[in-house]
Amino acid sequence: MEADDHVSLFRFPFKIPTFRGIRKGGVYLSGALYALGFWIFLDAVLYSRYSNASDVHVTFIDWIPFLCSTLGTLIVNSIEKNRLLQGALSSDGGAFGSGVGDLDSSMAWQARTVLFFGFALLAGGLSGSIVVLIIKFLVKDYNTYPTLGMGVNNVLGNVCILLSCVVLWIAQNVEDEYSYSLTL
């Protein structure tokens, strides 16, 4: 038996990618989803500006959910998973701890708070685009495709950005077999 062969429960006719390959693929998939979401929204903006024959156009109100989703993506993906678990893994940390454990717990609390605000911006961006679709297009009876398509593109763009954020978060924080967490 060679050194590269390892015993596994199942045999597949293909090679399973390593965690490094999965991480790289996840980052690329996330970028593709963000680019797709941006292009879908930009398509609606350009259609509204140059080809739209109706009296409804994409305004700054339509941009606000997109900007919230983008800002939420930046905030969520700037937090490391290790920061979230920092206070729980320290041996000195606790409700009445002092010293380094208390500092770790404080940093973990701050990271969780910032992460909450990031996810709140993402959820607000998606729900805001749905509200814009309902109030601006459906309530005012603009339910024909080219005009309604601007609102649908806004929602689809925000969904793609949300999925991009989730894929990037998972890809960045996946544990591979060669990473070690040393705590003293």
Curated annotation (Swiss-Prot):
Compartment list: Vacuole membrane; Mitochondrion
For the modification Phosphoserine, the affected residues are 8
Q: Which UniProt keywords apply?
A: Acetylation, Glycoprotein, Membrane, Mitochondrion, Phosphoprotein, Protein transport, Transmembrane, Transmembrane helix, Transport, Vacuole
Q: Which residues are glycosylated?
A: 52
This protein's membrane topology, according to the annotation, is:
Multi-pass membrane protein
Write down a Pfam family by its short name: UPF0220
User: What Gene Ontology cellular-component terms does the record carry?
Assistant: endosome; fungal-type vacuole membrane; mitochondrion; Vps55/Vps68 complex
Q: Quick check: keyword NADP in the entry? A: no
> Transmembrane segments in this chain: where?
26-46, 56-76, 115-135, 150-170
Which biological processes are named by the entry's GO terms? late endosome to vacuole transport via multivesicular body sorting pathway; protein targeting to vacuole
Q: Which residues carry this modification: N-acetylmethionine?
A: 1
Q: Which InterPro entries match?
A: UPF0220 (IPR007919)
* UniProt superkingdom: Eukaryota
What the protein does comes down to:
Involved in vacuolar protein sorting.
Miscellaneous information on this protein: Present with 1900 molecules/cell in log phase SD medium.
Family of this protein: Belongs to the UPF0220 family.
What is the protein's given name? Vacuolar protein sorting-associated protein 68
Tell me which species this is from: Saccharomyces cerevisiae (strain ATCC 204508 / S288c) (Baker's yeast)
